[in-house]
UniProtKB/Swiss-Prot annotation:
Ribonucleoprotein keyword on record: no
GO biological process, one term: tetrahydrofolate interconversion
GO molecular function: methenyltetrahydrofolate cyclohydrolase activity; methylenetetrahydrofolate dehydrogenase (NADP+) activity
Protein name: Bifunctional protein FolD
Signal sequence, start to end: none
Magnesium recorded as keyword: no
Reaction(s) the record says it catalyses: (6R)-5,10-methylene-5,6,7,8-tetrahydrofolate + NADP(+) = (6R)-5,10-methenyltetrahydrofolate + NADPH; (6R)-5,10-methenyltetrahydrofolate + H2O = (6R)-10-formyltetrahydrofolate + H(+)
Annotated residues for binding of NADP(+): G166, R167, S168, S191, I232
Assembly, per entry: Homodimer.
Swiss-Prot/TrEMBL keywords: Amino-acid biosynthesis, Histidine biosynthesis, Hydrolase, Methionine biosynthesis, Multifunctional enzyme, NADP, One-carbon metabolism, Oxidoreductase, Purine biosynthesis
Amino acid sequence: MTIIIDGKKIANDLCERLSQKIDILKREYNIFPCLKVILVGSNPASQVYVRNKQKKAESIGISSETIVLPDNISEDELIEKINELNEDPSVHGILVQLPLPNHISASRVINTVSVEKDVDGFHDENVGKLVKGEKNCLIPCTPKGSLHLIKSIEENLSGKNAVVIGRSNIVGKPMFYLLLQENCTVTILHSQSKDLAEYCSKADIVVAAVGKPNFVQADWIKKGAIVIDVGINSVNVGKLVGDVDFEGIKGKAKAMTPVPGGVGPMTIAFLMMNTVIAACLQKGVDASNFIS
């Protein structure tokens, strides 16, 4: 019988514990975590994501504000706004909601955000620290949340064969390095790779983040594998499905995540955690006491 990993419940439990730690930060350290989200334009999906982030932040005691800017804002004007937030000591986390309009360089914007306020974990310096295995860095939220879900099923991953399907800077590549740090043997694949079925059939862990509905087939999956579905695809007038054949794999995998209700809530939970880590880093407080 396949365990359907309830990401929503796990995320809520994490946020409940984090809320208690935030109370301690406020009471004993006079640290009031603050997150600023910049939304450029009026993309409906981005508006929903930002609203969910702000709602969760406020529910656990993180001060949060969304700064909405017009989609015709110049790159330099956006950079200027980010620098204002960088210089504000009361702001601990800065998130620029992606995607950005085509005339704005996402890379330049991401690397303008202060390394210690980069709660998305996308800044080149934080990426470099992740690659080197350093602990005092901010790690992208979706892979961090995905790893937590895997470890909710199996704590010791040492020696496991893991496959990551997808090579994005947001999920695939950081997921590769996180699994490597857990002493897994990791293979990274993508939509153009050959012999995906062969690689997946040997994997104890499969993380799918390729952005194609039902891309991962049931006959690719080894019996007893853990399958994490990061994909979220809209099909048939608003129905959401992931990157894996959920019904086909259910009953074969040891555990798997649903879409929705799997990885999505964990991304937001770890954004909250990164905001607390960022606040601790900036105030010289050991973050490990507040994120366990």
